[in-house]
Amino acid sequence: YYYDDYGFLDILDTSVANRLTYKRKTGYSQQAAAKTYLTGKRVYSLTNDDQFEIEALYYDRFGNHIASCTHNINGEYSYTYQKCDLSGTVLKSFAEYQTADGGSVTESAEHTYDHDSRLTRTRYTLNDTLVNTRYFQYDELGRLTRLSRNNGTTYASYEYDLQGNITSIKDVDFEQKLYYNTGDGIPRYNGKISSMKWLTPSIDNTDTITNGYSFAYDQQDRLVSAYSSSGKYGQERYTEEFTYDKQGNIAMLYRYGG
């Protein structure tokens, strides 16, 4: 590991050092001094001491990591850039991967936030082509309630209880419910999950399959059993039980069914 400056680049081949040296990218944060920060990493091959991957890391004047340049043992280079605001929040990022034969791939992401600094939109671009946009919605308590993907054509929704524990996740072909002091398990009032179930479509998409688990804990709140309650496979298939030693390590693990 290297810190404080970029003198380690001087011991590299000139061509490699030049390509790992920071070059400003328009629209992204500007490099500043890196005193006290990690500036480089060298990772050697386990089979050949002459082969290594080396990375240079760069920072802005607020100490935010804003760029990296990497050269690997295959002769490939990768470059990443970030634009950050004063608090260090990433507003946009860019990455380029260059192969040894001269090929390259670029990807970028732009992030939008609301007045409470919550992420509301991310736009992903691959080789200058927009490939996906994600939208994020929140409730009045700041909890994520909806995630829209694929430019808004698919989505997942989330529900919570009064304590802020997530209770439901619904996606296109998947639904999961988590129970704390309700459901089939022993009620838990400390945030531990007492049971859960999830629903998925059958292979031929003509039916909905329900699977589930009920959980039990010991007096130290360690998980001691997970009992399967699958409607398709029958009771206790994939059930697990745990025992612990005096130090809290798992001593025995039992699995049933399969």
Question: Model segments located where?
Answer:
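Acidic/glycine-rich beta-solenoid
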Residues: 6-60, 65-258
